Amino acid sequence: ATLFVVIYVMEHAEVLAKIGFLVGKLIAMGEKSGTLALLWASAGFSSVTDNIPLSAMLAKILDANPDVPSNYKAMQWWAVVFGSNLGGNLTPIGSASTVVAVTIMAKHKVPLSFVGFVKRAAPFAVLQLLIASVYIMIVGLILN
């Protein structure tokens, strides 16, 4: 229930409108470029905020744009799903799994700073996002 309260407050504070405007700019870049920009932007945002509220917020924004053709919209949904989930792996605060990992490391007295975590996680997160980018482009070719 808290998630919906956060989204409701963000909607009434016009935060969703501002983010929606920025997402619209990304989408306007074109079918392929815009989708990839959406993937990488949602990954970037997800690395510094929890991915579940981010996904819910972006879903609401994408759903509010009825003018997008269905095959392009499918690519956008995949971009948001992959970006918000995989981007959370970049930092120790981006997803529940990384928070758990950091907690376990602290419990076993394994020293790892925030920057150290990012340095070790970045290559894996970037590789995952590159694979997701290729996957989305292949799906886009199939849908078109």
Task: Place the predicted regions along the sequence by residue.
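Juxtamembrane and boundary regions of transmembrane helices in multi-pass small-molecule transporters
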Residues: 82, 86-144
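Hydrophobic mid-bilayer segments of alpha-helices in multi-pass membrane transport proteins
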Residues: 1-5
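Short hydrophobic alpha-helical membrane-anchoring segments
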Residues: 8-12, 47, 133-141
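Membrane-interfacial helix-loop connectors
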Residues: 9-110
